[in-house]
Curated annotation (Swiss-Prot):
It catalyses: UDP-N-acetyl-alpha-D-mannosaminouronate + N-acetyl-alpha-D-glucosaminyl-di-trans,octa-cis-undecaprenyl diphosphate = beta-D-ManNAcA-(1->4)-alpha-D-GlcNAc-di-trans,octa-cis-undecaprenyl diphosphate + UDP + H(+). The lineage of its organism: Bacteria, Pseudomonadati, Pseudomonadota, Gammaproteobacteria, Enterobacterales. InterPro entries: UDP-ManNAcA_Trfase_WecG (IPR023085), WecG_TagA_CpsF (IPR004629). This is UDP-N-acetyl-D-mannosaminuronic acid transferase. Pathway: Bacterial outer membrane biogenesis; enterobacterial common antigen biosynthesis. Catalyzes the synthesis of Und-PP-GlcNAc-ManNAcA (Lipid II), the second lipid-linked intermediate involved in enterobacterial common antigen (ECA) synthesis. CDD domains: Glyco_transf_WecG_TagA. The keyword Glycosyltransferase applies.
Amino acid sequence: MTALKTTETIPLYTIRGLPIHGFRNMGTFVDYLFAGERVETGTLVAINAEKVLTAEKEVALRTLLDRAEYKYADGISIVRSIRRKYPQADVTRIAGADLWEALMERAGKQETPVFLVGGKPDVLAQTEAKLRAQWDVNIVGSQDGYFTPEQRDALFERIRASGAQIVTVAMGSPRQEILMRDCRHHYPDALYMGIGGTYDVFTGHVKRAPLVWQNLGLEWLYRLLSQPSRIFRQLRLLKYVAYHYSGRL
């Protein structure tokens, strides 16, 4: 079963010209990806307001996003915009960090081979150890984020030779999207997921917002209070707020 065949049944919502797949909840998403004899192939990309704005300015990123089979609403602002534009939409926010953990748990149960890319060497090692201890994940290979452009082809060959069915890349956007795109040219038979700083959160090196903040859609505010230097990034999002309330979605 291929990603292109199955995505035909997933509701699609367009925000600023970018198609986004909508799911009722994360469990439905995970079940969908694992519905066949093996996990689906393709690329998972989290969409938030900042990424929408960046894609409008950077053609290369927009092209990468357009080619990704699964674009899901990670940011609460995207969910609210979908509901505003499509009042009948049954869609919820799916945080990338939570989705990754759910995929790893399911991969452990189904013995799905996983390859991890990105992060600092010590954080990556801790991530591997915790995944094996917590969910018995079959990790068939890993590579920290400190490799040169000249080493990329060798990494792609390692991923192909490992037989991994899930490849998660923690390098930040758009580096991780570029790496996944290029790796898929060498090895298309896997599900690729860009996960930013998720390894740091998973291993406790970075503290995530408390659940009550997450449920209120205020995780962005918690991060801002924890890291005041993010204020300039947040100010950029005023443009998206204008899009939302003016109906230019």
